[in-house]
């Protein structure tokens, strides 16, 4: 884990996260001071002396499909934070002026069809509607059978994508936290008792047919 993950925007910085060619057990961070062996607290805490809007991190990506060459993820603060307009300004500048191959918009599954979500999708369609776009629908582990419908929620997003005129979009239903726990278990990465209990719950959830997210992905990837 190299960055904070919260429902609310938690930093006013652009994080550039680079993959390393091999695993050496070290994670480097450039946040005002270059640290070639940054520990967890260093990674989770922004340096108050950094007057720029950027933080760079270099680490090995534990990709289940293996490494495929150099990769940089640019993580933005978010745009829907009414508590800090700076976050929205930094993010919009990155979206409008940034040079990237693909834009990933993380959709909170619990906030689908809200006014904020629709307004931002409209903004993306107007500014980047022709570019490759991934809508990662996160937190689907929070859906409850009989109350929520994954298929209907995803179809609602596809309907917005079509109506707003996105030309090159895909929708990827995910549970980032379930994936995080699963990878910690696979790599024997010091899971605590609470995390093991949570992983057991996630496993039970995603064994159910209605939570089979693989059903929404193509069987073959070009």
What are these regions (language model features)?
Residues 1-219:
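Globular "head" domains of long coiled-coil molecular machines
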């Amino acid at each position: 884990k190299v960055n904070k993950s919260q429902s609310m925007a938690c930093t006013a910085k652009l994080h550039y996260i680079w993959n390393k060619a091999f695993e050496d057990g070290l994670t480097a961070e450039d946040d005002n001071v270059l640290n070639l062996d940054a520990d967890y607290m260093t990674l989770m805490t922004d340096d108050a002396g950094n007057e720029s809007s950027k933080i760079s991190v270099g680490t090995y990506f534990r990709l289940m499909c293996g490494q495929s060459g150099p990769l940089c993820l640019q993580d933005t603060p978010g745009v829907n934070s009414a508590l800090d307009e700076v976050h929205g300004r930094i993010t919009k500048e990155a979206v409008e002026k940034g040079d990237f191959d693909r834009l990933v918009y993380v959709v909170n599954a619990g906030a689908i069809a809200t006014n904020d979500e629709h307004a931002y999708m409209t903004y993306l369609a107007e500014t980047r509607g022709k570019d490759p776009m991934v809508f990662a629908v996160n937190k689907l582990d929070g859906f409850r059978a009989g109350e929520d419908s994954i298929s209907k929620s995803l179809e609602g997003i596809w309907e917005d994508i079509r109506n707003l005129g996105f030309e090159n979009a895909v929708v990827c239903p995910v549970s980032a936290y379930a994936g995080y726990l699963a990878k910690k278990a696979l790599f024997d990465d010091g899971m605590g008792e609470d995390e093991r209990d949570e992983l057991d719950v996630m496993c039970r959830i995603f064994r159910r047919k209605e939570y089979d997210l693989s059903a929404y992905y193509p069987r073959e990837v070009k």
